[in-house]
Curated annotation (Swiss-Prot):
Keyword Membrane: no
Superkingdom in the source lineage: Eukaryota
Originating organism: Arabidopsis thaliana (Mouse-ear cress)
Tissue expression notes: Expressed in roots, stems leaves and flowers, but not in seeds. In short days, observed in cotyledons and roots but absent from rosette leaves.
Annotated localization: Mitochondrion
Protein family (similarity comment): Belongs to the LEA type 3 family.
BP term (GO), one: regulation of photoperiodism, flowering
Protein name: Protein SENESCENCE-ASSOCIATED GENE 21, mitochondrial
Induction of its expression: In short-day conditions, follows a diurnal pattern of regulation, with transcription repression in the light and activation in the dark. Induced by oxidants (e.g. hydrogen peroxide H(2)O(2), menadione and paraquat). Accumulates in response to abscisic acid (ABA) and dehydration. Induced by ethylene, more strongly in the younger leaves than in the older ones. Up-regulated 12 h postinfestation (hpi) in green peach aphid (GPA; Myzus persicae Sulzer) infested leaves. Triggered by cold, wounding and salt. Strongly induced by the necrotrophic fungal pathogen Botrytis cinerea.
Name of the gene encoding the protein in the UniProt record: SAG21
Main localisation: mitochondrion
Alphabetically ordered keywords of this record: Mitochondrion, Plant defense, Stress response, Transit peptide
Pfam families: LEA_3a
Biological role: Mediates tolerance to oxidative stresses (e.g. hydrogen peroxide H(2)O(2), diamide, menadione and tert-butyl hydroperoxide) by minimizing the negative effects of oxidation and monitoring photosynthesis during stress. Promotes root development. Prevents premature aging (e.g. senescence and flowering). Involved in resistance against compatible pathogens such as Botrytis cinerea and Pseudomonas syringae pv. tomato.
């Protein structure tokens, strides 16, 4: 009998703690959502207009993809050549001497 009462106390403490955490988290999420809606009314429209304009500018620039001569993988034509870290280190050390 005493063992079952002890188990009930442990389970009830765990359930009440988890229930309290769930209620607190839910309240915080609802408050955060209300704050973002009320403060972002007008600035949200401005941001979306800027995003639309930026999207139009990006779509007008056409970037062609060409195969890389070393690897054979396709990459943007405007991309710069990558240098190996060991080669860069060797080049910098040779210039210092």
């Amino acid at each position: 009998m005493a063992r079952s009462i002890s188990n009930v106390k442990i389970v009830s403490a765990f359930v009440s703690r988890e229930l309290s955490n769930a209620i607190f988290r839910r309240g915080y999420a609802a408050t955060a959502a209300q704050g973002s809606v009320s403060s972002g009314g007008r600035s949200g429209a401005v941001a979306s207009a800027v995003m639309k304009k930026k999207g139009v500018e990006e779509s007008t620039q056409k970037i062609s993809w060409v195969p890389d001569p070393k690897t054979g993988y396709y990459r943007p034509e405007t991309g710069s050549n990558e240098i190996d870290a060991a080669e860069l280190r060797a080049a910098l050390l040779n210039n210092k001497q």
